[in-house]
Regions:
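Formylglycine-dependent sulfatase
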Residues: 1-392, 403-423, 427-434, 440-463
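Acidic carboxylate motifs that coordinate Ca2+ or other divalent cations, activating on Asp/Glu
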Residues: 400
Length: 463
Protein backbone atom coordinates (compact mmCIF):
# COMPACT_ATOMS: atom_id res chain seq x y z
CA UNK A 1 0.00 0.00 0.00
CA UNK A 2 1.48 3.33 -1.06
CA UNK A 3 0.19 6.61 0.39
CA UNK A 4 1.22 9.87 -1.21
CA UNK A 5 0.73 13.26 0.49
CA UNK A 6 0.57 16.44 -1.61
CA UNK A 7 2.76 19.48 -0.77
CA UNK A 8 3.77 18.18 2.66
CA UNK A 9 6.73 19.80 4.40
CA UNK A 10 9.68 17.85 5.77
CA UNK A 11 9.07 19.63 9.08
CA UNK A 12 5.37 18.75 9.27
CA UNK A 13 5.99 15.33 10.84
CA UNK A 14 8.26 13.66 13.37
CA UNK A 15 10.34 16.65 14.40
CA UNK A 16 10.22 18.77 17.53
CA UNK A 17 8.65 22.12 16.73
CA UNK A 18 7.95 24.47 19.64
CA UNK A 19 5.13 26.31 17.89
CA UNK A 20 3.20 23.31 16.61
CA UNK A 21 2.33 20.10 18.40
CA UNK A 22 0.08 18.61 15.74
CA UNK A 23 -1.22 15.24 16.92
CA UNK A 24 -0.58 12.65 14.20
CA UNK A 25 -0.91 9.41 16.16
CA UNK A 26 -1.38 7.14 13.16
CA UNK A 27 1.59 8.46 11.22
CA UNK A 28 3.61 8.35 14.44
CA UNK A 29 2.68 4.69 14.88
CA UNK A 30 3.65 4.00 11.27
CA UNK A 31 7.00 5.64 11.97
CA UNK A 32 7.47 3.44 15.04
CA UNK A 33 6.72 0.33 12.98
CA UNK A 34 8.98 1.14 10.05
CA UNK A 35 12.00 2.93 8.65
CA UNK A 36 12.23 6.68 8.06
CA UNK A 37 13.83 8.25 5.02
CA UNK A 38 14.00 11.59 3.28
CA UNK A 39 13.14 11.28 -0.39
CA UNK A 40 13.98 13.81 -3.10
CA UNK A 41 11.20 14.24 -5.62
CA UNK A 42 10.35 16.39 -8.61
CA UNK A 43 8.64 16.46 -11.99
CA UNK A 44 9.34 18.53 -15.07
CA UNK A 45 5.73 19.27 -16.02
CA UNK A 46 2.16 18.27 -15.27
CA UNK A 47 -1.08 18.24 -17.21
CA UNK A 48 -3.86 20.84 -17.45
CA UNK A 49 -7.64 20.61 -17.10
CA UNK A 50 -7.93 20.56 -20.88
CA UNK A 51 -4.94 18.33 -21.65
CA UNK A 52 -5.55 15.83 -24.43
CA UNK A 53 -2.51 13.74 -23.45
CA UNK A 54 -0.88 12.31 -20.38
CA UNK A 55 1.78 9.84 -19.38
CA UNK A 56 3.15 8.59 -22.74
CA UNK A 57 1.94 5.11 -23.64
CA UNK A 58 5.55 3.97 -24.06
CA UNK A 59 5.95 4.39 -20.29
CA UNK A 60 4.83 1.59 -18.01
CA UNK A 61 3.52 2.01 -14.45
CA UNK A 62 4.33 -0.35 -11.59
CA UNK A 63 0.56 -0.89 -11.36
CA UNK A 64 0.58 -2.37 -14.88
CA UNK A 65 3.43 -4.72 -14.02
CA UNK A 66 1.75 -5.88 -10.80
CA UNK A 67 -1.63 -6.21 -12.50
CA UNK A 68 -0.06 -8.45 -15.15
CA UNK A 69 1.42 -10.51 -12.30
CA UNK A 70 -1.95 -11.26 -10.69
CA UNK A 71 -2.36 -8.33 -8.30
CA UNK A 72 -5.66 -6.56 -7.74
CA UNK A 73 -4.81 -2.89 -8.22
CA UNK A 74 -6.77 0.12 -7.03
CA UNK A 75 -6.08 3.82 -6.87
CA UNK A 76 -7.75 6.47 -4.71
CA UNK A 77 -7.08 10.19 -5.19
CA UNK A 78 -5.07 12.48 -7.43
CA UNK A 79 -3.85 11.01 -10.73
CA UNK A 80 -2.59 14.02 -12.74
CA UNK A 81 -1.07 11.92 -15.51
CA UNK A 82 -3.83 12.49 -18.04
CA UNK A 83 -7.60 12.00 -17.77
CA UNK A 84 -8.65 11.96 -21.41
CA UNK A 85 -9.60 8.59 -22.89
CA UNK A 86 -6.89 5.94 -22.62
CA UNK A 87 -4.78 8.09 -20.28
CA UNK A 88 -7.21 7.34 -17.43
CA UNK A 89 -5.86 5.27 -14.50
CA UNK A 90 -8.07 2.30 -15.43
CA UNK A 91 -6.13 2.05 -18.69
CA UNK A 92 -2.73 2.42 -17.01
CA UNK A 93 -2.73 -0.55 -14.68
CA UNK A 94 -5.50 0.05 -12.14
CA UNK A 95 -8.55 -2.20 -11.87
CA UNK A 96 -10.39 0.53 -9.97
CA UNK A 97 -10.08 4.30 -9.66
CA UNK A 98 -11.85 6.82 -7.43
CA UNK A 99 -10.65 10.39 -7.18
CA UNK A 100 -9.83 13.77 -8.67
CA UNK A 101 -7.96 13.52 -11.99
CA UNK A 102 -5.66 16.44 -11.11
CA UNK A 103 -4.91 18.85 -8.24
CA UNK A 104 -7.78 19.94 -6.02
CA UNK A 105 -7.12 23.63 -6.80
CA UNK A 106 -7.75 23.13 -10.53
CA UNK A 107 -11.48 23.76 -10.44
CA UNK A 108 -14.20 25.54 -8.50
CA UNK A 109 -16.44 24.01 -5.83
CA UNK A 110 -19.68 25.15 -4.19
CA UNK A 111 -17.99 25.35 -0.78
CA UNK A 112 -14.41 26.47 -1.44
CA UNK A 113 -11.66 25.39 0.89
CA UNK A 114 -9.04 27.68 2.39
CA UNK A 115 -6.63 29.23 -0.09
CA UNK A 116 -4.63 32.38 -0.72
CA UNK A 117 -6.03 34.26 -2.57
CA UNK A 118 -9.55 33.12 -1.71
CA UNK A 119 -11.39 31.66 -4.68
CA UNK A 120 -15.14 32.12 -5.19
CA UNK A 121 -17.62 29.25 -5.36
CA UNK A 122 -18.84 27.86 -8.66
CA UNK A 123 -21.52 29.96 -10.25
CA UNK A 124 -24.69 28.38 -11.61
CA UNK A 125 -25.04 30.89 -14.40
CA UNK A 126 -22.62 32.87 -16.51
CA UNK A 127 -19.08 33.01 -15.14
CA UNK A 128 -17.38 36.37 -14.84
CA UNK A 129 -13.66 36.55 -15.51
CA UNK A 130 -13.09 39.00 -12.66
CA UNK A 131 -14.21 36.56 -9.99
CA UNK A 132 -12.02 33.71 -11.24
CA UNK A 133 -9.02 35.48 -12.73
CA UNK A 134 -6.72 34.57 -9.81
CA UNK A 135 -7.95 31.00 -9.59
CA UNK A 136 -6.91 28.08 -11.75
CA UNK A 137 -10.16 27.29 -13.53
CA UNK A 138 -13.82 28.23 -13.54
CA UNK A 139 -14.71 24.64 -14.45
CA UNK A 140 -16.21 22.67 -11.57
CA UNK A 141 -13.88 20.15 -9.90
CA UNK A 142 -14.91 16.59 -10.88
CA UNK A 143 -14.89 13.38 -8.85
CA UNK A 144 -14.41 10.25 -10.95
CA UNK A 145 -15.22 6.62 -10.31
CA UNK A 146 -13.32 4.69 -12.95
CA UNK A 147 -14.10 6.69 -16.13
CA UNK A 148 -17.38 8.23 -14.98
CA UNK A 149 -17.84 11.63 -13.31
CA UNK A 150 -20.01 10.88 -10.27
CA UNK A 151 -20.02 14.38 -8.78
CA UNK A 152 -19.26 17.82 -10.22
CA UNK A 153 -18.43 20.00 -8.43
CA UNK A 154 -17.34 17.65 -5.68
CA UNK A 155 -17.70 18.46 -1.99
CA UNK A 156 -14.10 18.59 -0.77
CA UNK A 157 -15.17 18.91 2.87
CA UNK A 158 -16.46 15.32 2.84
CA UNK A 159 -13.71 14.01 0.56
CA UNK A 160 -11.68 12.47 3.38
CA UNK A 161 -14.54 10.22 4.47
CA UNK A 162 -15.26 9.16 0.90
CA UNK A 163 -11.61 8.42 0.15
CA UNK A 164 -11.38 6.39 3.35
CA UNK A 165 -14.54 4.42 2.54
CA UNK A 166 -13.36 3.73 -1.00
CA UNK A 167 -9.94 2.57 0.20
CA UNK A 168 -11.43 0.23 2.81
CA UNK A 169 -13.85 -1.18 0.23
CA UNK A 170 -10.99 -1.93 -2.18
CA UNK A 171 -9.01 -3.71 0.53
CA UNK A 172 -12.05 -5.90 1.22
CA UNK A 173 -12.51 -6.49 -2.51
CA UNK A 174 -8.97 -7.82 -2.80
CA UNK A 175 -9.61 -10.17 0.13
CA UNK A 176 -12.83 -11.50 -1.40
CA UNK A 177 -11.03 -12.06 -4.70
CA UNK A 178 -8.18 -13.80 -2.86
CA UNK A 179 -5.62 -11.73 -4.71
CA UNK A 180 -2.56 -9.85 -3.49
CA UNK A 181 -3.30 -6.15 -3.78
CA UNK A 182 -1.75 -2.82 -4.64
CA UNK A 183 -3.56 0.16 -3.15
CA UNK A 184 -2.22 3.55 -4.20
CA UNK A 185 -3.73 6.45 -2.23
CA UNK A 186 -2.76 9.88 -3.58
CA UNK A 187 -4.15 12.32 -1.03
CA UNK A 188 -5.50 15.81 -1.66
CA UNK A 189 -3.95 16.72 1.71
CA UNK A 190 -1.88 18.97 2.16
CA UNK A 191 -2.50 20.84 -1.10
CA UNK A 192 -4.57 24.03 -1.08
CA UNK A 193 -7.44 24.67 -0.88
CA UNK A 194 -7.31 23.14 2.59
CA UNK A 195 -10.29 21.30 4.02
CA UNK A 196 -10.73 19.30 7.19
CA UNK A 197 -13.25 17.55 9.38
CA UNK A 198 -15.64 20.27 10.63
CA UNK A 199 -15.50 18.73 14.11
CA UNK A 200 -11.82 19.60 14.51
CA UNK A 201 -11.46 22.52 16.90
CA UNK A 202 -10.13 25.26 14.63
CA UNK A 203 -10.10 27.70 17.52
CA UNK A 204 -7.16 25.78 18.96
CA UNK A 205 -5.82 24.34 15.70
CA UNK A 206 -4.79 26.49 12.76
CA UNK A 207 -6.36 25.42 9.45
CA UNK A 208 -3.17 23.75 8.23
CA UNK A 209 -2.77 21.89 11.50
CA UNK A 210 -6.39 20.76 11.41
CA UNK A 211 -5.93 19.52 7.86
CA UNK A 212 -2.77 17.64 8.89
CA UNK A 213 -4.71 15.94 11.69
CA UNK A 214 -7.43 15.14 9.16
CA UNK A 215 -4.89 13.48 6.89
CA UNK A 216 -3.55 11.44 9.79
CA UNK A 217 -7.07 10.23 10.56
CA UNK A 218 -7.54 9.12 6.94
CA UNK A 219 -4.29 7.16 6.97
CA UNK A 220 -5.37 5.62 10.28
CA UNK A 221 -8.67 4.39 8.86
CA UNK A 222 -6.82 2.58 6.08
CA UNK A 223 -4.27 1.11 8.50
CA UNK A 224 -7.12 -0.16 10.69
CA UNK A 225 -8.70 -1.86 7.67
CA UNK A 226 -5.44 -3.66 6.92
CA UNK A 227 -5.35 -4.85 10.53
CA UNK A 228 -9.03 -5.84 10.60
CA UNK A 229 -8.62 -7.97 7.49
CA UNK A 230 -5.54 -9.58 9.11
CA UNK A 231 -3.30 -8.62 6.20
CA UNK A 232 -0.11 -8.77 8.25
CA UNK A 233 2.10 -9.22 5.19
CA UNK A 234 1.28 -5.72 3.91
CA UNK A 235 3.98 -3.16 3.19
CA UNK A 236 2.91 0.46 3.76
CA UNK A 237 4.92 3.25 2.12
CA UNK A 238 4.06 6.83 3.09
CA UNK A 239 5.76 9.76 1.37
CA UNK A 240 5.10 13.11 -0.33
CA UNK A 241 5.51 14.58 -3.80
CA UNK A 242 7.41 17.77 -2.93
CA UNK A 243 7.80 20.41 -0.25
CA UNK A 244 5.22 22.98 0.89
CA UNK A 245 3.81 25.73 -1.32
CA UNK A 246 5.20 28.60 0.71
CA UNK A 247 3.52 31.40 -1.25
CA UNK A 248 0.29 30.15 0.38
CA UNK A 249 1.68 31.47 3.70
CA UNK A 250 -0.38 30.22 6.68
CA UNK A 251 -1.91 27.52 4.48
CA UNK A 252 1.45 25.89 3.72
CA UNK A 253 3.67 23.50 5.63
CA UNK A 254 7.01 23.58 7.39
CA UNK A 255 10.39 22.89 5.75
CA UNK A 256 12.11 22.24 9.07
CA UNK A 257 15.79 23.27 9.02
CA UNK A 258 15.96 23.17 5.21
CA UNK A 259 15.22 26.85 4.65
CA UNK A 260 17.38 27.61 1.59
CA UNK A 261 18.80 30.70 3.23
CA UNK A 262 21.02 31.68 0.28
CA UNK A 263 17.85 32.14 -1.77
CA UNK A 264 15.53 33.57 0.89
CA UNK A 265 18.08 36.21 1.89
CA UNK A 266 17.98 37.45 -1.71
CA UNK A 267 14.21 37.31 -2.10
CA UNK A 268 12.06 34.51 -3.39
CA UNK A 269 10.98 31.12 -2.19
CA UNK A 270 12.95 27.98 -1.43
CA UNK A 271 10.22 25.34 -1.13
CA UNK A 272 7.83 23.83 -3.71
CA UNK A 273 8.87 24.27 -7.35
CA UNK A 274 12.52 24.71 -6.35
CA UNK A 275 15.45 22.34 -5.92
CA UNK A 276 16.44 23.76 -2.54
CA UNK A 277 16.19 21.04 0.10
CA UNK A 278 12.88 22.39 1.41
CA UNK A 279 11.44 22.03 -2.08
CA UNK A 280 12.07 18.36 -2.62
CA UNK A 281 13.03 16.73 0.68
CA UNK A 282 9.92 15.02 2.02
CA UNK A 283 9.13 12.83 5.05
CA UNK A 284 9.02 9.14 4.20
CA UNK A 285 8.38 5.97 6.17
CA UNK A 286 8.17 2.36 5.00
CA UNK A 287 6.71 -0.26 7.35
CA UNK A 288 6.45 -4.02 6.85
CA UNK A 289 5.83 -6.26 9.89
CA UNK A 290 8.61 -8.78 10.60
CA UNK A 291 10.55 -7.57 7.55
CA UNK A 292 11.61 -3.96 8.22
CA UNK A 293 13.23 -3.08 11.54
CA UNK A 294 10.78 -0.96 13.59
CA UNK A 295 11.59 2.66 14.51
CA UNK A 296 14.75 2.75 12.42
CA UNK A 297 16.19 5.53 10.26
CA UNK A 298 18.20 5.55 7.05
CA UNK A 299 20.40 8.43 5.92
CA UNK A 300 20.91 6.96 2.44
CA UNK A 301 20.42 9.33 -0.50
CA UNK A 302 17.14 8.18 -2.07
CA UNK A 303 14.71 9.41 -4.70
CA UNK A 304 11.02 9.07 -5.48
CA UNK A 305 12.17 7.26 -8.62
CA UNK A 306 13.30 4.38 -6.39
CA UNK A 307 9.70 3.45 -5.57
CA UNK A 308 9.08 1.75 -8.94
CA UNK A 309 11.97 -0.77 -8.91
CA UNK A 310 11.74 -1.36 -5.16
CA UNK A 311 8.05 -2.23 -5.04
CA UNK A 312 8.47 -4.66 -7.92
CA UNK A 313 11.52 -6.21 -6.28
CA UNK A 314 9.74 -6.69 -2.96
CA UNK A 315 6.81 -8.27 -4.80
CA UNK A 316 9.17 -10.65 -6.59
CA UNK A 317 8.20 -9.25 -9.98
CA UNK A 318 10.66 -8.31 -12.71
CA UNK A 319 10.12 -5.09 -14.69
CA UNK A 320 10.31 -5.12 -18.51
CA UNK A 321 13.90 -5.51 -19.70
CA UNK A 322 13.55 -3.37 -22.83
CA UNK A 323 14.39 -0.08 -21.09
CA UNK A 324 16.57 1.51 -18.42
CA UNK A 325 15.25 2.73 -15.08
CA UNK A 326 16.32 5.90 -13.30
CA UNK A 327 15.56 4.64 -9.81
CA UNK A 328 17.43 2.03 -7.81
CA UNK A 329 16.16 -0.99 -5.92
CA UNK A 330 16.49 -0.06 -2.24
CA UNK A 331 15.46 -3.45 -0.87
CA UNK A 332 18.83 -3.85 0.87
CA UNK A 333 18.35 -0.48 2.58
CA UNK A 334 14.86 -1.37 3.78
CA UNK A 335 15.52 -4.92 4.94
CA UNK A 336 19.21 -5.04 5.82
CA UNK A 337 20.10 -1.56 7.14
CA UNK A 338 22.38 -0.76 4.20
CA UNK A 339 23.14 2.94 3.68
CA UNK A 340 24.28 2.56 0.07
CA UNK A 341 21.96 4.95 -1.73
CA UNK A 342 22.56 7.04 -4.83
CA UNK A 343 25.96 8.61 -5.40
CA UNK A 344 24.30 11.40 -7.36
CA UNK A 345 20.84 12.63 -8.34
CA UNK A 346 20.04 15.12 -11.10
CA UNK A 347 17.26 17.63 -10.48
CA UNK A 348 15.62 19.33 -13.47
CA UNK A 349 13.73 22.59 -13.17
CA UNK A 350 10.11 21.93 -12.21
CA UNK A 351 8.50 25.32 -12.49
CA UNK A 352 10.83 27.95 -11.03
CA UNK A 353 13.78 29.55 -12.86
CA UNK A 354 14.83 28.30 -16.28
CA UNK A 355 12.87 26.22 -18.75
CA UNK A 356 10.96 23.07 -17.81
CA UNK A 357 13.42 20.20 -17.82
CA UNK A 358 16.60 22.31 -17.63
CA UNK A 359 19.24 20.75 -15.40
CA UNK A 360 18.98 22.95 -12.33
CA UNK A 361 20.82 21.12 -9.56
CA UNK A 362 23.12 18.13 -9.12
CA UNK A 363 23.28 16.32 -5.78
CA UNK A 364 26.56 14.46 -5.21
CA UNK A 365 26.53 12.56 -1.91
CA UNK A 366 26.38 15.37 0.69
CA UNK A 367 27.30 18.14 -1.77
CA UNK A 368 24.88 19.99 -4.00
CA UNK A 369 25.63 22.12 -7.08
CA UNK A 370 23.19 24.80 -8.28
CA UNK A 371 23.30 25.91 -11.90
CA UNK A 372 20.04 27.91 -11.74
CA UNK A 373 18.43 29.75 -8.80
CA UNK A 374 15.46 32.08 -8.23
CA UNK A 375 12.06 32.26 -9.84
CA UNK A 376 9.80 30.89 -7.10
CA UNK A 377 7.44 33.14 -5.18
CA UNK A 378 7.72 33.45 -1.40
CA UNK A 379 4.98 34.24 1.10
CA UNK A 380 4.10 37.89 0.62
CA UNK A 381 5.33 38.01 -2.98
CA UNK A 382 8.74 38.37 -4.53
CA UNK A 383 10.30 35.57 -6.53
CA UNK A 384 13.98 36.47 -6.47
CA UNK A 385 15.97 37.25 -9.57
CA UNK A 386 16.70 34.35 -11.89
CA UNK A 387 20.40 33.50 -11.93
CA UNK A 388 22.42 31.11 -14.08
CA UNK A 389 25.56 30.05 -12.24
CA UNK A 390 28.63 29.04 -14.23
CA UNK A 391 30.52 27.75 -12.39
CA UNK A 392 27.75 26.51 -10.08
CA UNK A 393 27.12 27.33 -6.44
CA UNK A 394 28.15 24.31 -4.36
CA UNK A 395 26.93 23.66 -0.82
CA UNK A 396 28.09 21.06 1.71
CA UNK A 397 24.84 19.82 3.26
CA UNK A 398 26.67 17.90 5.97
CA UNK A 399 27.83 21.24 7.38
CA UNK A 400 25.17 23.60 6.00
CA UNK A 401 21.71 22.05 5.82
CA UNK A 402 20.18 25.53 5.61
CA UNK A 403 22.07 26.07 2.31
CA UNK A 404 23.34 29.46 3.38
CA UNK A 405 27.05 29.67 2.48
CA UNK A 406 28.36 28.10 -0.75
CA UNK A 407 31.90 26.76 -0.92
CA UNK A 408 34.71 29.06 -2.01
CA UNK A 409 35.28 28.39 -5.76
CA UNK A 410 39.03 28.66 -5.15
CA UNK A 411 39.07 25.90 -2.53
CA UNK A 412 40.36 22.39 -3.18
CA UNK A 413 37.05 20.96 -1.96
CA UNK A 414 35.09 23.00 -4.50
CA UNK A 415 37.35 22.01 -7.40
CA UNK A 416 37.18 18.32 -6.49
CA UNK A 417 33.38 18.32 -6.15
CA UNK A 418 32.94 20.25 -9.41
CA UNK A 419 34.99 17.68 -11.33
CA UNK A 420 32.81 14.88 -9.95
CA UNK A 421 29.60 16.81 -10.69
CA UNK A 422 30.65 17.38 -14.31
CA UNK A 423 31.55 13.69 -14.66
CA UNK A 424 28.21 12.51 -13.21
CA UNK A 425 26.24 14.98 -15.36
CA UNK A 426 28.00 13.82 -18.52
CA UNK A 427 27.22 10.19 -17.68
CA UNK A 428 23.54 11.02 -17.21
CA UNK A 429 23.33 12.92 -20.51
CA UNK A 430 24.98 10.00 -22.30
CA UNK A 431 22.51 7.60 -20.68
CA UNK A 432 19.58 9.73 -21.87
CA UNK A 433 21.02 10.08 -25.37
CA UNK A 434 21.44 6.32 -25.78
CA UNK A 435 18.14 5.22 -24.21
CA UNK A 436 14.54 5.25 -25.38
CA UNK A 437 13.05 8.64 -24.49
CA UNK A 438 9.31 9.25 -24.64
CA UNK A 439 7.71 12.64 -25.29
CA UNK A 440 4.53 13.79 -23.59
CA UNK A 441 1.77 15.60 -25.46
CA UNK A 442 0.91 18.76 -23.52
CA UNK A 443 -1.58 20.09 -26.07
CA UNK A 444 -4.90 21.30 -24.68
CA UNK A 445 -8.38 21.26 -26.17
CA UNK A 446 -11.65 22.52 -24.62
CA UNK A 447 -13.23 19.21 -25.62
CA UNK A 448 -10.88 17.41 -23.21
CA UNK A 449 -12.13 19.34 -20.15
CA UNK A 450 -14.01 16.95 -17.80
CA UNK A 451 -17.69 17.91 -17.88
CA UNK A 452 -20.57 15.63 -16.92
CA UNK A 453 -23.30 17.79 -18.43
CA UNK A 454 -22.48 20.51 -20.94
CA UNK A 455 -22.45 23.42 -20.70
CA UNK A 456 -22.82 23.83 -16.92
CA UNK A 457 -20.72 20.81 -15.78
CA UNK A 458 -22.94 20.01 -12.81
CA UNK A 459 -24.19 16.60 -11.68
CA UNK A 460 -24.51 14.41 -8.60
CA UNK A 461 -24.91 10.66 -9.00
CA UNK A 462 -23.34 9.50 -5.72
CA UNK A 463 -25.49 7.16 -3.67
Amino acid sequence: MRTFSDDIGWGDLWVKRPHNSTPTPWLDSLRDKGKRHGLRNGVTHNFAVGSVGGLPFEEITFAQVLQDSGYYTAMIGKWHLGHNGSYSPVHRGFDYYYGIPYSNDMGCTDKPGLDLPTCPPCMHGQYTAGKHEQCYSKVALPLFENETIVEQPLDTWSLKERYAAAAVKQIKTSVSRKQPFLLYVALAHMHVPLFHNPFFNVTTQAPYTASLSDMDSLVGTIMEAVSTEQLENTLIWFTGDNGPWEQKCQFSGNVGPFVGRWQTSRGGGSAKRTTWEGGHRVPTVVAWPKKIKPNSTSNALLSGMDIFPTILSLAGVKPPSDRRYDGMDITDILLNDSNSGHKSIMHPNSGAAGQFGDLQTVRLKHHKAFYITGGSEACGGGSGQQHYHQPPLIFDLSQDEAEEAPLNPDSDEYRFVLREVVKESAALLLDIATDKVSTANYRTDPAAVPCCQNPICRCHSLK
